[in-house]
Regions:
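Periplasmic/cell-envelope proteins involved in peptidoglycan metabolism and beta-lactam response
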Residues: 1-359, 467-474, 656-689
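Beta-lactam-recognizing serine transpeptidase/beta-lactamase-like catalytic domain environment
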Residues: 273-286, 299, 329, 336-390, ...
């Protein structure tokens, strides 16, 4: 063994040194002269001859004793190495002949609620090498040319210190088979370079559900530091946990990012025997990697595809009916009984496969162009818009609760409202006027003056001057819904405090909250902002009597090494987010009746389209106005009215009137769910906004 040999050599060197020292000392103590006057007997040069001999013998005895002690210690050490610590030194010797490398784990799949794979894995090849390859600049440059990568990038990957000096460092992933073949055929040109089998993400349905699923990419230095802090430790506390290395593939958006801790597997280890040149000569042991868990989502692929198809069709309809700027939009379909997201689409979409192996600069720039449509933005949860008239059912509940508009109160709509004085008059969307309107008919016909009267009453009610905002917030507006996806928007419910702090460049007078501000938010205009998901959650409450469950896309996680569900959403499948206070059953009934009339009474077009569906649908249209842009089309609804199972909320940016274009999204999705396609050819009559 090398350690024993070292000790023996050291002992021999020590003995030789001592012998040399003795010879020198012997020579020094035996220097004699001849006395010519008294014969030829030699005499010591210093002192008497007996004294010199005695001194020499004393020093020799001391050295002999020292040498004996050293040999005794050496013998004890050799005995200990051979008999007591032989296992330790054997392991040390073996470690110099082996290398331990980490092995990657397969990432978990993402499935729909019925087990259909939305994201799966495919085999791929990676180029790997040991760190000492970095010392050969010519080889590194040659490898960079073959891989089509910058020299500095290849060198950086080889020198990376997060994978350990003896680990194989990932240089390139998802390498073309032609490139791999070249490296293998010219192995002599690439000593120390290996080909490793890996897996890459595969999307069987292309762009479907791209905003929910998200995408993966190489871990960034910031992510690497943050992730490994979670599993760092000085003992075995982190054993069996996920650890990350430079070059690892992690979730960067959507479910891939939010549930990274479930999808990511636990890497394994493989110990290989190597020769003096570092070439692998055999296997010495392995700890297998543990695959990540499969995640089952609440999505129903059939409904998801229906949402995407319906949204794209409605946008095309808007373009062909005078709204050429249409192109973006979103739709959410959820279960009002538990908050499960059944379908969610955002337009435009993107192809998540472009991120495999690293996205090019040109593609990344296109996806993030400030002047473009931002395909990576999930408008269903991050897009923030004026709610338009879809908020009027909530305004009605607020008016009924605080008495600012009663069930028997009426408003005479002439098409122009002057409740705040002629100088601050406001138009109704129907400039010819609706005539006498009650609160229920005001909802059905989306009559603006009814809600102007309500907003004015709130403003001048000293006790409940912000009662309208209170109700909006109670129904979940102005704050995130808590969905398990990144980057959810909170929206905005404006009030006096917000206006004072927001318009800092305006005069003190202009920063004051006024009656006009209140009348604006009563009809969903002005500075109010909501997301499609927030409106879907609000209509969830309208459908089930005020209860709102946390919207979520996660259903369960299934360990691929186990035999069942590893984790289910909240244990029982639903978690209440809030329960909006409803003043009375009669108030809710009035609002629901108004939503019924929106579809079946006030609009002949809506009645024609929805009348061919077996279940009754209650809903509300909306048409948002934004300066310098075309109108934004909204439609929110739930069905069946007597036993709600589906809530759908949709918005089309610059897509026209809600009852003209957006309503088709809701109708088409329900048509797929109930297998009752829309057979009506009736065009929008714009009788409801």
């Amino acid at each position: 063994m090398s350690s024993q040999l070292t000790v023996i050599i050291a002992g021999i060197v020590l003995v030789v040194a001592i012998v040399v020292a003795l010879v020198i000392m012997r020579r020094g103590d035996s220097r004699f002269t001849y006395d010519t006057q008294h014969g030829t007997t030699p005499r010591a040069t210093e002192g008497e001859g007996n004294t010199a001999v005695t001194a020499f013998k004393g020093r020799f005895s001391i050295l002999t004793t020292g040498v004996g002690a050293m040999f005794a210690a050496l013998a004890v050490k050799l005995w200990g190495m051979q008999m007591v610590s032989s296992d330790y030194y054997e392991k040390q010797a073996n470690s110099n002949q082996t290398r331990t490398v980490t092995t990657s784990a397969v990432r978990g799949r993402i499935l729909d609620r019925n087990g259909v794979a939305l994201v799966q894995n495919r085999p791929s090849l990676a180029v790997v090498a040991y760190r000492d390859l970095a010392e050969d600049e010519v080889l590194v440059r040659h490898l960079a040319n073959v891989l089509g990568m910058p020299y500095v990038a290849v060198l950086r990957n080889i020198q990376d210190n997060t994978e350990g000096a003896q680990s194989l460092h990932t240089i390139a992933t998802d390498v073309r088979r032609s490139t791999v073949a070249y490296i293998q055929e010219h192995a002599g040109e690439f000593p120390g370079v290996k080909i490793a089998e890996r897996t890459e993400r595969q999307y069987p349905y292309g762009e479907t559900a791209c905003h929910i699923l998200g995408y993966t990419g190489t871990i960034t230095s910031e992510q690497l530091e943050a992730q490994n802090k979670k599993t760092s430790g000085d003992d075995d506390a982190s054993a069996g946990k996920i650890t990350y290395q430079s070059g690892d593939i992690v979730g960067q958006a959507g479910v891939e990012s939010y549930y990274e801790n479930l999808l990511q597997g636990i890497r394994g280890e493989q110990t290989v025997k190597v020769d003096a040149s570092g070439n692998v000569t055999g296997q010495a042991g392995a700890v297998p990697a543990k695959a990540g868990s499969d995640i089952k989502l609440t999505l129903d692929l059939k409904i998801q595809q229906a949402c995407e198809t319906a949204l794209a069709s409605a946008i095309e309809l808007a373009k062909t009916t005078g709204y050429s700027n249409a192109g973006n939009g979103a739709v959410v379909c959820l279960d009002p009984n538990n908050g499960e997201i059944l379908g969610m689409a955002s337009q435009p979409k993107f192809d998540p496969s472009v991120f495999i192996g690293g996205v090019s600069n040109d593609v990344w720039t296109e996806l993030n162009d400030d002047k473009g449509s931002h395909p990576l933005l999930n408008r269903a949860i991050s897009g923030q818009y004026m709610s338009a008239s879809t908020i009027k059912p909530l305004s009605a509940l607020a008016g009924l609760e605080f008495g600012t508009y009663t069930s028997t109160q009426t408003t005479n709509c002439t098409g122009y409202w002057t409740g705040l004085g002629k100088a601050w008059g406001k138009r109704c969307w129907l400039t010819s006027g609706h005539g006498t309107m009650t609160l229920q008919s005001g909802i059905a016909n989306s009559c603006d003056p009814v809600f102007y009267d309500m907003g004015k009453a709130f403003f001048y009610d000293e006790q409940h001057s912000e009662g309208l905002q209170e109700v909006f917030r109670r129904w979940g507006l102005g704050k995130t819904c808590g969905i398990d996806l990144p980057s959810e928007g909170a929206g905005r419910i404006p009030d006096a405090e917000w206006k004072e702090s927001y318009f800092t460049d305006a005069s003190a007078e202009d920063r004051k909250w006024n009656a006009g501000d209140m009348t604006n938010i009563a009809i969903g205009q002005g500075d109010i902002l909501v997301t499609p998901l927030q409106m879907a959650c609000a209509y969830m409450g309208l459908a089930n009597g005020g209860k709102q469950y946390v919207p979520h896309v996660f259903l369960s996680a299934v360990s691929r090494d186990g035999d069942g569900d590893a984790y289910k959403y909240n244990g029982k499948g639903k978690k209440k987010r809030l329960e909006a206070k409803i003043n009375s059953d009669s108030d809710l009934a009035l609002v629901r009746n108004g939503m019924h009339d929106v579809i079946y009474t006030a609009s002949t077009s809506l009645a024609a389209h929805f009348g061919t569906l077996t279940p009754q649908v209650y809903g509300k249209s909306g048409t948002g106005e934004k300066s310098g842009e075309d109108e934004y089309a909204w439609f929110c609804a739930y069905a069946p009215a007597d036993d709600p199972k589906y809530v759908i909320a949709t918005v089309l940016e610059q897509g026209g009137g809600g009852s003209d274009t957006a309503m088709h999204v809701v109708r088409d999705v329900l048509g797929v769910i109930y297998d009752e396609p829309d057979t009506s050819s009736a065009s929008g009559d714009s009788s409801v906004r």
